[in-house]
């Protein structure tokens, strides 16, 4: 990478490399030096962008949120006017992608989430970035007629996180369910949730 790389592009490269290292090596494998070496950057480049470990972790969390927000293309996002089928299709597709083509991001997210339990300053940052997704989901379930949006969002997030953790890091890690299986499970959950 050139010494003259724009700061935003270098920041993305550092954050993407940090996420890849978290997925591959875990929290212990994430160091400023490892990011420099893996990204092919001159030594000290990562430190120039993120002086402290906390700053590097925050950079990774911010990039994770940006990349996860783009898991679905605009035309794939659930449309409340499309009813329950639209919600099921969109959420199932996002969950399936987290298990398959975005598996590395999912692993990195779990590494960061666990680290956030030991670092209050990271917890606050991690929770704030996650609030964007929760707010969007709250809007969707409210539009579907949820009588208790906060509880329903918690149930949906718990279902998705449980499935993703089990299939990425848990005892079901050898094979991710197919999109049809994810969709069927989600449909069962939402049918019960909305009394259909």
Question: For each predicted feature, which ranges?
Answer:
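Hydrophobic/aromatic-rich alpha-helical bundle segments in the mid-to-C-terminal region
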Residues: 3, 123, 127, 142-196
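Solvent-exposed, amphipathic alpha-helical segments
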Residues: 13, 17-24, 71, 108, ...
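Helix-turn-helix
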Residues: 13, 17-59
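Anionic, Ser/Thr-rich low-complexity intrinsically disordered regions
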Residues: 16, 22-23, 41-45, 75, ...
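Short loop-to-helix capping motifs
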Residues: 52, 115-120
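Short, basic, alpha-helical segments at the C-terminal edge of helix-turn-helix-like DNA-binding modules
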Residues: 62-68
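Amphipathic alpha-helical packing segments from all-alpha helical-bundle domains
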Residues: 69, 100-107, 118-144, 154, ...
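Hydrophobic alpha-helical connector segments
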Residues: 70-106, 153-156, 179
